Structure formats: C-alpha cells, structure tokens
C-alpha cells in the first residue's frame, strides 16, 4: 500500500494521562473522556478519508504529523504574519510527544496492527488560520 494522508479538523489535542478510580479495594485506570472522544474522531476521519486501508502486520511504518494550532485572537497582525511565515512556533501544550501518542494509539488496529510498527516518526507544531492535524503514514521497509 502506498502512502496514506488524512486530516483531522479542529485544534490539536494530546494524549491525556490515565485517571484512576477506586473500585472496592482496587484502583482501576480509565481513559479521560476528552481523550477517548478525540481518539474516536481520529478513527472516524481515517476511515472516512482513507477508506479503511490497513498496513500488514509485518510492515515497518513511518508517520509524519503536522499539528496546526490556531493563532490566538489577541495576537497583533505583525506577530500573526511571523507565525504564519513559520518564524514563531507554538511553544504551548499539547506537547509534541502527546500528539504523536494519541494518533498512534487511535490508529492501533485501524491503520496498522500495532503502533510498535512505527519505526520513523515526527511531529511538527505550527500556527495556521485553520486549526487541524495532517497525518501521513507510509511503509519504510519490509520485515522478515
């Protein structure tokens, strides 16, 4: 399968830390609702745009994620231009690694069998007038 590309509209969101609840004498971990909702959005957009394409379990994969954050409304026109020209980068949350993690986890069993297949990955955070996340996945070699 060739490279696949898809876009998730809206502001980028990073993987939230698991929460714990007490059930009897035990602590039970659970995924925060906002994280679960965003993972479902990723899955839906992948299925809709990539038509259920799935890489084989032996494929070594690369993933490139570009997260476009909105320019804050209080930003001057001069500073906005610098942000759009990629001279100022988003230094705020979500962290780049949490963005990558939520996409890898959401696409487990959807685009690929397991996120351990990702051997080459990169996340870039930029500013844009239209917030979104663009994702590319490709085969980088054959295992076995």
Regions found by a protein language model. Give the residues of each.
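Acidic, proline/glycine-enriched N-terminal capping motif
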Residues: 1-144
